[in-house]
Amino acid sequence: MASPSKGNDLFSSDEEGPAMVAGPGPGPGGAEGAAEERRVKVSSLPFSVEALMSDKKPPKETSPRPAESASAGATLRPLLLPGHGVREAHSPGPLVKPFETASVKSENSEDGAAWMQEPGRYSPPPRHMSPTTCTLRKHKTNRKPRTPFTTSQLLALERKFRQKQYLSIAERAEFSSSLNLTETQVKIWFQNRRAKAKRLQEAELEKLKMAAKPMLPSGFSLPFPINSPLQAASLYGASYPFHRPVLPIPPVGLYATPVGYGMYHLS
């Protein structure tokens, strides 16, 4: 029959953990090994007194297995379409970007080559000018043809116009019937003839204005005749007791400047 101390050891060993029960039987050597193992575990803790006193760093954690890391990477990698995967496998991104920038730069250089050939000269690109179309005045489609007046009709109309430029309705009706014309034709002819007479009158007035303008400029006017030496002498103080001799006056045509600047030679 087992002693009570042995029973207590069995119960304590059951409480400590399954590692202690798994052995063949408790012995003095097994108990010492378990105590040493507990001391090692306690001393290996980073917050234990022994670890703080010894100032030892805890051992680094071992890296996970490569299979686990590969599986984690496979789970974290986003899903891609088949086309994307092939494109990434055959053409990496860093190699494509310089090629794209180089192609853009080459295109820009080709565009600017024509501008940089002659740096001292500005030559804008040629413009394609569209030919200018001559816009003519469009006549009305329902326009009536001009009335071909005969010579006798024109003479009668001119004679009537010199007598009276404005006809009343009764006079116009009577005159048009005598010439075998409509009232509208006579009315339009008189309107055109009055406009022509007005233009001729304005041209005559313009000719009269041009003829009335003096040939000499307006500032070239003399208040006295040049050939009268007495009036010229009176301007220079001839009434004083000491008279200046009157000098002969040269003709005015020899001077290009106005008369006041050198008409008289004073000594």
From Swiss-Prot:
Residue spans crossing the bilayer: none
Q: Where is the protein found, in the record's own terms?
A: Nucleus
| The entry's DNA-binding region | 142-201
According to the UniProt entry, which residue ranges have a biased composition of type Basic residues?
A: 136-146
Supply the CDD domains for this chain.
homeodomain
Q: Which PROSITE patterns match?
A: HOMEOBOX_1, HOMEOBOX_2
Family to which this protein belongs: Belongs to the Msh homeobox family.
Quaternary structure (record): Interacts with MINT, with XRCC6 (Ku70) and XRCC5 (Ku80).
Summarize the protein's role. Answer: Acts as a transcriptional regulator in bone development. Represses the ALPL promoter activity and antagonizes the stimulatory effect of DLX5 on ALPL expression during osteoblast differentiation. Probable morphogenetic role. May play a role in limb-pattern formation. In osteoblasts, suppresses transcription driven by the osteocalcin FGF response element (OCFRE). Binds to the homeodomain-response element of the ALPL promoter.
Protein name in the entry: Homeobox protein MSX-2
Q: What is the protein's species of origin? A: Bos taurus (Bovine)
Q: What is the lineage of its organism?
A: Eukaryota, Metazoa, Chordata, Craniata, Vertebrata
Name the gene for this chain: MSX2
